[in-house]
Amino acid sequence: MALIRLVAPERVFSDLASMVAYPNFQVQDKITLLGSAGGDFTFTTTASVVDNGTVFAVPGGYLLRKFVGPAYSSWFSNWTGIVTFMSAPNRHLVVDTVLQATSVLNIKSNSTLEFTDTGRILPDAAVARQVLNITGSAPSVFVPLAADAAAGSKVITVAAGALSAVKGTYLYLRSNKLCDGGPNTYGVKISQIRKVVGVSTSGGVTSIRLDKALHYNYYLSDAAEVGIPTMVENVTLVSPYINEFGYDDLNRFFTSGISANFAADLHIQDGVIIGNKRPGASDIEGRSAIKFNNCVDSTVKGTCFYNIGWYGVEVLGCSEDTEVHDIHAMDVRHAISLNWQSTADGDKWGEPIEFLGVNCEAYSTTQAGFDTHDIGKRVKFVRCVSYDSADDGFQARTNGVEYLNCRAYRAAMDGFASNTGVAFPIYRECLAYDNVRSGFNCSYGGGYVYDCEAHGSQNGVRINGGRVKGGRYTRNSSSHIFVTKDVAETAQTSLEIDGVSMRYDGTGRAVYFHGTVGIDPTLVSMSNNDMTGHGLFWALLSGYTVQPTPPRMSRNLLDDTGIRGVATLVAGEATVNARVRGNFGSVANSFKWVSEVKLTRLTFPSSAGALTVTSVAQNQDVPTPNPDLNSFVIRSSNAADVSQVAWEVYL
């Protein structure tokens, strides 16, 4: 026994084994353990939960470590003790050593887990497939609503005494109504988590006031019901570091690095999570680095993910108000995935609502860099970037996803894409560079593309309805805007193309109309577009058996010279050389069209008459026609008219 000195009641030990073996502790003793895991202790005979870090069993009682602030992993003799310590709420642990996880570590409410520069947790798939869990549970009992609760309402009602809800209680609402954020292929039903801010009872009915409005109608006809879940609240993970680089241990696969279910106010920052997927491989071991299921008010900031089998951050269930900032994901399936739930094994409830991703980067993902699967509402990505994805850079598989100032580089498919049954993603000031198929693909259900750019793809924009407004498109080999449908049963809707720069740069047409899939050009309007350099060949058509009617066109440019000037009428007429153009044939895969000439009278002699344009002619020089020799005639209804007339040529 290594008792160094004994000055009652002080007892000082040089090693842990000696301390826990000492048989004669008294309650009044002052006890000190030396060394890196040392500290001061008190002795008690009161039963305590032993974790071999802050509480030790000794002969006749227990030693309790005296400390203020966090506990340290270096205090604990094994992983099991850390699991025991963190199994209670209100814990604060600093991981300052390399830990081998032999089971999942459950984290409870009001707890913080911090990692130092030397702190790590290494998973061990032989005994634990998950690493960190922040997990509550769904209600075990549900009660029906007493009356319908409409979307936008912040009050629900139940029968008096049916639900033990008080201020601060969380509620979980659900019904048989299907989620409507996207195609919802699996038939997931609606649900939401809300917090009680007030309760009142009158006339046999309890009214419960909620902290936030409902997103859906909860109707009795849909079997709307409510229960009280067990929630884990207020958890913070600072610099979590899971796994290491440069290992050969194939047993370190994990299904989830950090998994949260029925949690609120969960915050993860500055972490590193490393999977065991072979570099570049598509195996699915290690499903998610971080997984939020039925969580509210969650954030991830400044965290890096590497070699994850599936997702960097996965969001599913009725998770709401989730924000992900400044993450970096390398060689994962998707950096961020808002995910569906399969109902093959039974009913599922909830879709992600109010998701925001900001300044996130995805590198060399094995599928789309950022994905939204099938359901979800009010989803937005801001200043996010995808590099070298093996599929799309960004994929919207739920309706109305909004992208602001995002960028996609060198995707194997589309820079930005939607999917079957998905309507109207919104792109604002986004950039797409050198993506194989298209910069922006809105051909599954329409979309809005505002002030964006696409360069170096087959098509700048593939679209079947909506709006392309502003922006610049270059080096797209087939066309800058391809009006098509990627799914035959998708309905074409009206399309506005306005103020777009599609100047000819040696490749491709300005606009391509895909008659093979039934595209009707009359549903398209084109105005204020710069198609300089395309000349007669601004449009490409295919698949039409008879010549279609062209789109509505106004103030588009085909040239930057020879399109404005002033003419003086002589005897009521002037012939003007200008770059007027037209196609007057009736070939099926072509439009019949002619330039629009705008006339503005500059002088008003007494002989002024009504002005018209006649006799548009195109130069036919062989082998190369000269567009500067094209001409049109301005004619006045008064043969004596000598007015000066300004003219402008548009398409």
Swiss-Prot record:
Changing R333A: Almost complete loss of enzymatic activity. Keywords: Degradation of host capsule during virus entry, Degradation of host cell envelope components during virus entry, Host-virus interaction, Lyase, Viral attachment to host adhesion receptor, Viral attachment to host cell, Viral tail protein, Virion, Virus entry into host cell. Homotrimer. Belongs to the K1-specific depolymerase family. GO terms for biological process: adhesion receptor-mediated virion attachment to host cell; symbiont entry into host cell via disruption of host cell envelope; symbiont entry into host cell via disruption of host cell glycocalyx. Its EC number is 4.-.-.-. This is Depolymerase, capsule K1-specific. It comes from Klebsiella phage NTUH-K2044-K1-1 (Bacteriophage NTUH-K2044-K1-1). The keyword Lyase applies. Residues 71-559 are annotated as: Interaction with the host capsular trisaccharides. GO terms for cellular component: virus tail. The lineage of its organism: Viruses, Duplodnaviria, Heunggongvirae, Uroviricota, Caudoviricetes. Changing H334A: Almost complete loss of enzymatic activity. It is an enzyme of class 4 (lyase).
